[in-house]
């Protein structure tokens, strides 16, 4: 099978604009010749491989604007409120990641099915890999502003707020971290699923079913990340940012098994099961 996915009516600045993703899927099944005559063994092998595309949602495509206020001047006097003045410079940033792509996932699996004398065993192994999953990444922006000096100003002799043109200032720079949506998640999933069902034993009219699975998930960052040290020298934080690979991640494993005893008593028209 083949499925296509695309987002329409996007701004041409998006890399997703006009891009079509194709998700092919192939399944195959092979039944081997039976082995034996009295109680023949049946074996079936099957498998499949395919792609799955997940598009970013509205919140990722159109994030809110980021507003950042920096105080350049804050002159205040209790005795003469008429001279009070504050000057704030506001920065407005667009946090849209126009390079955001769809998250692509490739999964394949194989299955073996064995049947003999009403006993059946199914074993499935699967593996799933995604290297472009969505996550919140960090982006640093440099903001340059002026810090005005109020040294030498005497509120008692002033008739109005200070004029910025008459004040000396020192240019300053601040690095601000922001959250942006990226394709920085790498996820690898693999596992084995199995199920065994026995024939119904005549004496106790009971059938045993055993099913379970083993799963393993590996999650980490597929893109470099920015980090800023928290060291403070002379009352100011260091203005350097480092770029590092894979600063986080984890591996999760789980295994579970379930035993079910299914009993049928036709004379009493009664059936019940017990699971452990």
Q: Which residues make up each language-model segment?
A:
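Structural signature of Gram-negative outer-membrane beta-barrels, strongest in the C-terminal barrel
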Residues: 1-120, 124-128
């Amino acid at each position: 099978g083949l499925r296509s996915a695309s987002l329409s009516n996007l701004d041409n600045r998006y890399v997703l604009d006009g891009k079509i993703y194709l998700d092919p899927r192939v399944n195959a099944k092979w039944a081997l010749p039976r082995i034996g005559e009295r109680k023949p063994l049946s074996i079936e092998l099957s498998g499949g491989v395919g792609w799955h595309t997940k598009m970013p949602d509205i919140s990722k495509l159109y994030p809110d604007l980021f507003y950042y206020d920096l105080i350049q001047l804050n002159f205040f006097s209790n005795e003469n409120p008429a001279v009070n003045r504050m000057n704030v410079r506001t920065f407005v940033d667009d946090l849209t990641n126009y390079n955001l792509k769809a998250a692509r996932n490739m999964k394949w699996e194989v299955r073996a099915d064995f049947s003999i004398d009403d006993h059946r065993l199914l074993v499935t192994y699967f593996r799933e890999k995604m290297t472009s999953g969505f996550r919140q990444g960090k982006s640093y922006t440099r903001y340059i502003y002026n810090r005005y000096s109020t040294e030498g100003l005497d509120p008692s002799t002033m008739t109005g707020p200070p004029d910025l043109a008459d004040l000396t200032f020192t240019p300053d720079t601040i690095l601000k971290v922001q959250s942006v949506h990226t394709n920085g998640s790498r996820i690898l999933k693999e596992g084995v699923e199995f199920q065994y069902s026995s024939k119904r034993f005549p004496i106790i009219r009971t059938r045993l079913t055993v099913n379970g699975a083993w799963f393993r998930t590996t999650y980490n960052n597929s893109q470099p990340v920015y980090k800023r040290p928290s060291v403070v020298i002379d009352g100011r934080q260091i203005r350097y940012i480092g770029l590092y690979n894979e600063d986080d991640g984890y591996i999760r494993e789980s295994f579970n098994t379930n035993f079910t005893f299914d009993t049928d008593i036709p004379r009493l028209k009664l059936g019940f099961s017990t699971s452990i």
